[in-house]
Amino acid sequence: MSEPTSSSSLDITSNCIIETPLQPSDFLPKSANLFPKFPERISVDSWELWEFDTFDTNGSVAFGCSLYRDARGVEQGGFHAEVNALWPDGTHWGETLYFAVSEVVENSDGTTGGKWLSKDGGSITFHIASDYTAAALDFNVPGKVSGTMELRNHANVSPTSNLPASDAEAQLCPGVYYTFPMGPVATSVTATFSSVGANGESRELFISSGYGGMVRGWSARPWPTFMNDAYYVVAQVGPYMLQILRTLGSVFVQHKPFAVARLYLDGSLVSAANTVVGDELTAHADDVKGDAVRLTKVQPDEKSQGLSGKFRDGNVGYVLEFAKKDSEHGWTFQISHKRAVWSEPTSAPGPDGTGKSGWIEAISGGAKGENYEGHGFGGQLQIPVP
């Protein structure tokens, strides 16, 4: 029977959050780095993330869960979890849930387990295989959500072979780490949500054969110090699976763009980009080494197919390009906001107000001459910092 070899348990009600800055433990090459980087205490600026996303093959159902360790839930007495679900008729269930205790363990068989536990017994737990080929989540939050989510890697090789081999390969920007540990995954969900829609009735959500991905992130730096605009998407487009987080830097980092992006073809990794190039970013083009991406916002016009957000950023989609330096290989994907999932302000209302929006994305493209079609699950964010 497997026994815990390392354990990190934080109780937000027991002074585990401190004012003194802390540095994360060292990055481990060729590891998913699932165990907490701030295992004993966490500072008011530090944060850690374990995220799991899934959507069905038709782009009609989505379910996402983001588990955090940070100081944002101190007043609510818990570490927060953001849970969102979307049904085919457009009904959305989304809540921020709070859990006093966050516990993560590494076991002797190499597996990793996590539990976010509230004082009244509600919980969200995850269990991840030692080779990152499978993950299972269990939701047991009375009056909110119950059920399971499963993710199973379907790449041609073990996910461990595609993990970052160096500290630099794992960084979104200096001191900020984002990785996609599982690569392409097949997913399934069976869940029941309480108080859904205007009638407040319970409703079940099923995904029998879907796609998705996992995200692991951490930093000692708060988000406003390195970004004011971000976009994330995980998608399956024909034989391609793609996953990208792109940020536009705040004044603290001279407004530079940053990205972590991965592109798989038939389960094989073909692009692992941590560099951004773009029309408005040509001043940084000389920094390009190896794989790179360009993400361009599509603004609404009479030919627009996508939906627009409710805030200052009114784009209707993106053009995402993967490229290899000194190579003819390249892939282009057209992304259109197909269905709204969530929409929340991040500033005071008004014509210059900022916010965050979640989308089911309609995506098409591939290599030159290809036009595969598929879907993705993503979100964009702007915050009111220069």
Swiss-Prot record:
UniProt keywords, alphabetically: Isomerase
EC number: 5.5.1.-
GO molecular function: isomerase activity
Pfam families (alphabetical): DA_C (PF22903), DA_N (PF24137)
Gene disruption: observed consequences: Leads to a significant decrease in the production of phomasetin.
Effect on the protein of changing residue 51 to A: Significantly decreases enzyme activity
Result of altering residue 381 to A: Significantly decreases enzyme activity
Activity modulation comment: 3-aminomethyl-p-menthane which is similar to the phomasetin substructure, dose-dependently inhibits phm7 activity in vitro and production of phomasetin in the fungus.
Entry superkingdom: Eukaryota
UniProt-annotated binding residues for substrate: 51, 84, 356
Pathway, per record: Secondary metabolite biosynthesis
Beta-barrel motif as annotated region, ranges: 223-386
Region (Beta-sandwich motif): 1-223
Known role: Diels-Alderase; part of the gene cluster that mediates the biosynthesis of the trans-fused decalin-containing tetramic acid phomasetin, the stereochemical opposite of the HIV-1 integrase inhibitor equisetin. The PKS module of phm1 together with the enoylreductase phm4 catalyze the formation of the polyketide unit which is then conjugated to L-serine by the condensation domain of the phm1 NRPS module. Activity of the Dieckmann cyclase domain (RED) of phm1 results in release of the Dieckmann product intermediate.
Family: Belongs to the Diels-Alderase family.
Protein name as annotated: Diels-Alderase phm7
Organism field: Pyrenochaetopsis sp
Chain's gene name: phm7
